């Protein structure tokens, strides 16, 4: 996806999207290893926030013309991930 972005976005939007995606999985992993449900839920909430960041950044990239309408599948998958994380949080609370 990010390969189609302009070169000047390499350290801007591309970098931010990549950091946000890494943040999602890293927070889930760290939270699951914390040993308490309360901590896990806290890290899941951070992962959820990062998932919303990714969605916003992807939509921005589409509006700026860096990505095509065909990339809506990625946004849809991000929305599915948000729902899964949200449902897990609700189940654990």
Regions found by a protein language model. Name each.
Residues 1-93:
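Amphipathic alpha-helical assembly/interaction segments
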């Amino acid at each position: 996806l990010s390969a189609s972005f302009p070169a000047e976005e390499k350290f801007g939007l591309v970098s931010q999207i990549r950091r946000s995606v890494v943040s999602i999985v890293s927070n889930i992993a760290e939270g699951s290893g914390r040993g308490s449900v309360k901590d896990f839920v806290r890290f899941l909430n951070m992962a959820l926030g990062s998932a919303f960041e990714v969605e916003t950044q992807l939509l921005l990239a589409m509006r700026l013309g860096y990505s095509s309408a065909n990339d809506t599948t990625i946004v849809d998958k991000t929305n599915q991930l948000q729902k899964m994380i949200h449902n897990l949080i609700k189940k654990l609370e």
